[in-house]
Amino acid sequence: MIKVAFFTNDLKNIDAHFGSGEQFAVYDVTKEGSTLFRIVPTGDERTEGRVEMLQDEGVDIMYCVEIGPAAAAKVVNGKIFPIKYKEVVRIEDELQKLSTMIASNPPPFIQKILEQRG
């Protein structure tokens, strides 16, 4: 299982900026599928606070539509893999893609997460 966070405004799409998104949705993802774990409001937290919130939820991978280089470095230093999309992507589509990857041939960074989680 991996834990994935999506910065989202509407809870359906990856459509929020890391620094200004008001919430993120955390999902547990396995080869069988995914389950919504929690919706986390970010409030007025700055970069460090947002990274801590992701860490507190046990997030392995974080998706957003925009993140600055300094913030991305802080996310990586927090042992979270950031993924940035330039366009809005449906959360459901990304969850299905992740489940399929886990079930078949996960890329090295996902394989490493799976091995660490045991």
What do the predicted segments below correspond to?
Residues 1-44, 49, 53-57, 77, ...:
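Non-catalytic interface/targeting segments
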Residues 64:
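Catalytic cysteine-centered active loop of the rhodanese-like fold, especially the PTP/DSP P-loop
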Residues 67-73:
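Short, glycine/polar-rich helix-capping loops at beta-to-alpha or helix-loop-helix junctions
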